[in-house]
Structures are given as C-alpha cells and as structure tokens.
C-alpha cells in the first residue's frame, strides 16, 4: 500500500522526506513534487496521470527539491535537526522552507508515483500566500529557488 511504498524509501539513512503523487478530486495531478523554476510551485499541477512527463519523469521515483506538506513522510531526527517547520510561514511555503533546510544539511527528498493519494487542496483553508511569506521565502532561499538542481525541464 502507499504507506509501505513511502516507508521503503525511508530505509535509506540520507532520505529526510518522501512524498506521493497527489491527485485533485477529478483525478488529475495536484503535485508531482516541487519545482522552483522560476518560482515555487507543484510540478505537473493539473496534468493527466496518464502522461509520461518529459523523459518519463512521472513514471519513476526520483530525487527532487521538495514535496508537498499535505502528505510528507519525514524522518523524525532530521526534522528536529533542521528545526522543523518555521512559524514564519503560517499559510504557505512551510513545506518549501522545510525541504530546503533538509537539502542544506545534505539530506535527500524523494517523490514517488507509486504512492497516490487525493488532496482536496484548500478544502480547510484559503489558497493564499501573504506578501510577507513570498518576500521571506525569496529572501531566505532565493539562491535555491532560482537554481532548481533537480528540475530544469517542464
């Protein structure tokens, strides 16, 4: 099942987080991991799960810059090592910030299409990013946001 699939990647000690393919209510992709080219967003948002993606990227587990906090399996000691989620991002970008903290410490983040879950995005909160959050994430991680080492295609 999906939980065992994600747990399998956590057997590698340098993996800090694993995320599944998240689907919208209508079955299209909500997130295939994060991409930060040219700004933080969900990779392949709105695309069909039947697509291969460039170079077959939607059909293989891969390292990525980050995964969506809606469903992110996290290694406990890595979470505490990096200071966990930041209170500076109460609505948006908290998963982006956490992912970058993991990467800065040398951990890997894995996205897998072999675990799939529905994500009813914004069903419990508004889909907003405050100007302060946008400015803070850009100031804190601009060097990484504008140079996504895992995603140079889309």
Regions found by a protein language model. Name each.
Residues 1-7, 56-83, 88-118:
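A short, conserved alpha-helix in the catalytic core of glycosyltransferases
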Residues 26-27, 38-64, 68, 73, ...:
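C-terminal, non-catalytic tails of nucleotide-sugar-dependent glycosyltransferases
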Residues 14-17, 31, 44, 67-68, ...:
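Short glycine/serine/threonine-biased micro-segments
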Residues 25-29, 92, 118-120, 124:
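Flexible loop/turn segments at secondary-structure boundaries
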Residues 11, 84, 104, 139-142:
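Residues at helix-coil transition
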Residues 1-40, 108:
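Conserved donor NDP-sugar-binding/catalytic core segment of glycosyltransferases
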Residues 21, 102, 113, 121, ...:
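Residues at the C-termini of beta-strands that transition into short coil/loop
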């Amino acid at each position: 099942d999906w939980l065992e699939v994600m747990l399998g990647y956590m057997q590698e000690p340098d993996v800090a987080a694993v995320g599944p393919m998240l689907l919208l209510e209508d079955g299209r992709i909500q997130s295939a991991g994060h991409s930060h080219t040219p700004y933080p967003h969900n990779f392949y948002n709105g695309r069909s799960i039947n697509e291969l993606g460039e170079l077959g990227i939607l059909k293989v587990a891969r390292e990525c810059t980050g995964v969506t906090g809606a469903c992110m399996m996290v290694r406990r000691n890595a979470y505490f090592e990096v200071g966990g989620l930041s209170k500076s991002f109460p609505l948006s970008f908290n998963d982006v910030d956490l992912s970058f903290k993991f990467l800065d410490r040398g951990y890997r983040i894995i996205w897998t299409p072999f675990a799939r879950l529905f994500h009813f995005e914004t069903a419990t909160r508004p889909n907003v990013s405050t100007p302060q959050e946008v400015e803070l994430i850009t100031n804190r991680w601009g060097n990484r946001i504008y140079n996504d080492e895992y995603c140079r295609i889309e």
